[in-house]
Amino acid sequence: MEKNEDEMRLPSFNEYLSGLCADRGEVPERIIKRANIERSFGHQLFKGTKNPSRDTVLQLAFGFEADVDAAQELLKHAGMSALYPRVKRDAAITYCLHNRFTIVETQNVLHDMKLPLIGGGKRSERCESSR
């Protein structure tokens, strides 16, 4: 019984992130940079000393250059709700993941659609210049 519990247990979120990095031959620094996450906060996520918000998990999905399925797995391992196509913002993010947009390109799509940006206030150059 105890053996089955160990096999069924999901790894902690930071263990999952580290495993993804190892599987992909990536270093956390590159993921954090591509995700447009502040460096020290990103390292705290990878160490497990900070817990991510749903938006931070989505940023990490873009950092990993994840497809929709991989992004859903990240959300699941973080204990967050999945992307839901009937929610306009989630549908836009799903579209961007499916089409391999970067985080900056995705922020521009969300901005153009007048939807909340991923991560709250981090606006891309294009978004900044359109103010």
State each model region's role:
Residues 1-29, 106-123, 130-131:
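A short, Lys/Arg-rich alpha-helix, primarily the initiator
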Residues 66-82:
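Short C-terminal boundary/hinge segments that cap the last helix of small helical domains
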Residues 49-63:
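Short, basic-rich loop-to-helix N-cap that marks the start of a DNA-contacting helix
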